[in-house]
Amino acid sequence: MGEHERVVCCSSDSLLAGLSRDSDDCVSHLCTPPLLAITSWAAKERSQYSPPPGEPGPSSDKALDCMTHWSRVLEPEIVNTASEQAGKSGAWEKEWDSEPQPHEGTPCSSSDVNKDHYHDQDLVKRNHCVAKKSLEPSSAKVKVKNTMIIPDSQKLLRCELESLRSQLQAQSKAFEFLNHSVTMLEKESCLQQIKIQQLEEVLSPTSRQGEKYGRKWSTEQELYGALAQGLQGLQKTLKEGEELQRARTTRCLQLLAREIRDSKKFLWEELELVREEVTFIYQKLQDQEDEISENLLNIQKMQKTQVKCRKVLTKMKQQAYDSWPEAEGVPTEGNGCCKDDLQKELGDIWSAVHSLQSSIDCLALSMGTRPRASSLRGQKGHQCKSSQCPSWDSDSDWERPFSKSGSYPPA
């Protein structure tokens, strides 16, 4: 209500401010602008708030009242202009009545609204009749006065007064119309509030469902956020574990590389030592081989000398056996001397043979072979008998060939 009152006050102030005090301007104000403004404003209000079809609108009645009042009060020229404008406004009203109104068919046209509308129309008609009755004597007086000779200044003053009266009446009617429109707007707002409440009641289950869905969505979002935080924590822990594993592996690899380097160095040192030892052993073996080869040559020489000695001994034995029966007829004294000489020679020979055999055994021991058991036996006072004497003719045991390796043949 406050906003509508402000609008009405502003419009009234503007209308009052638009009135001029000069006598020349009053006629121009009385001709067309007020009537046009009122009719156009009434048409606008009628377009906003149209009555149901088949009923005359209050705005059209008010506009017609204003035009009739102007036609009775103003001069004939002004009346002609007002009639023309009235015809135009009537044509506009017919056009507005023929056009479909936007509020037709809406649920706002209830029984209460129709009753209030009819009541307002009755009030407007009564006011119209009262205005006609009050204006009839005034119009007669104006006609009488027009016949009389009136000065121009009084005519101008009367015109101004009449224009002011007409404007005040138009403003009062506009105020009434605005009050009516405000009441209609209030009713429409009430109806709209009722509709809004009904719609809210209809939409309340859907809103509850929306709230439920919103809660579910919020819980899901919270769960997703918690899962995302957990995944981020797991990723951080995995990254830290990977970094630790990489650091450990790098440290282990570095330690292994150091150990491998140290082991390589140690192995190279060991290889150098082994090479030195191998070279030393190889040199020693070469020296031993040289010594063995020399010893073998000496043994071969000794064997050859031994063979020669055996041959000599066999020859001497044969000579002794051959000479033995011849010496049987010699006296015993001579036999004793020969025997002693022969025994001495044999003892010397046997000593030489034993010395050679011992030297051969020593060489064999130094070479690592088993010494061969000597088949020669002799003593200082040994007496050879034919049954116990070995066969000196076979020299197969003493003439065995040496092997390629230079080792002495086994016994």
Swiss-Prot record:
Coiled coil as UniProt keyword: yes
GO biological process, one term: sperm flagellum assembly
Keywords: Coiled coil, Differentiation, Spermatogenesis
A GO cellular-component term linked to this record: sperm head-tail coupling apparatus
Residue numbers spanned by region Disordered: 84-113, 372-411
Tissue: Expressed in spermatids but undetectable in the spermatozoon (at protein level). Highly expressed in the testis (at protein level).
Coiled-coil region: 269-305
Ranges of biased composition (kind: Polar residues): 384-393
InterPro entries in UniProt: CCDC159/163
Keyword Ligase: no
Bias type Basic and acidic residues, positions: 91-102
Function per UniProt: Functions during spermatid development; may participate in the centrosome reduction procedure of spermatids and is required for the formation of the connecting piece/sperm head-tail coupling apparatus (HTCA) and the correct and tight attachment of the flagellum to the nuclear envelope.
PANTHER family: COILED-COIL DOMAIN-CONTAINING PROTEIN 159 (PTHR34533:SF1), TRANSMEMBRANE PROTEIN CCDC163 (PTHR34533)
Quaternary state and interactors: Interacts with DYNLT2. Interacts with GGNBP1. Interacts with OSBP2.
Stated name of the protein: Coiled-coil domain-containing protein 159
